[in-house]
Amino acid sequence: YYTAYAAGDITTLSSIATPISANEQSYIGLFSQYVDEYQNIKCYTKTGLDANSYLVSVSMEIKFTGVDTTAPGLDFFYVRTNDDGTLYIDNLYSQYNLANQENALDTSVQSLIGQFESESDVVELQSEVQTRYDEALAADENLANMIQTTIPAAIKDWVSQVAAQAATEQTEATEAAEQPETEQPQETE
């Protein structure tokens, strides 16, 4: 998953995580431009709503392009089992969708995630990763610049582009809907 994410490989990501909206695909393409790789990936799991689903916290370090120090990070995934027994990431609960709410969520799963994230071991993990993250930013000016300036500026530009594209598509759809249908004269014999 993380190898594909760093490469912006939507085809591979889509085989692991579903659904991935068009906007999220675009965001992954943008973010992957700044990431060389993910390192030191560790998964922490608990059972989800049923025996075939899992709550997964993933700690990792992100190696950004042109930056020596890695940035500690923490991700969350809700993993389910397909009918054929293979696991997949239910991407409705991705950080992207949770932040942007492009797709509706199951309130039972959402509630379980909230409980999971407030459990003492998960809170401790979050605190540990946050401390390492703060220390890494304080120790490397290039890392701090990448995370606090470069990437936010790129995301701001991306959001503007997505909004402009959505507005253009809406205008075109409205204009198409407003076009009166003209009757074609029928030939008579």
State what each model feature region is.
Residues Y1-L13:
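Short helix-adjacent coil turns
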Residues Y2-Y5, T47, D90-L92, D140:
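Alpha-helix initiation/capping motif
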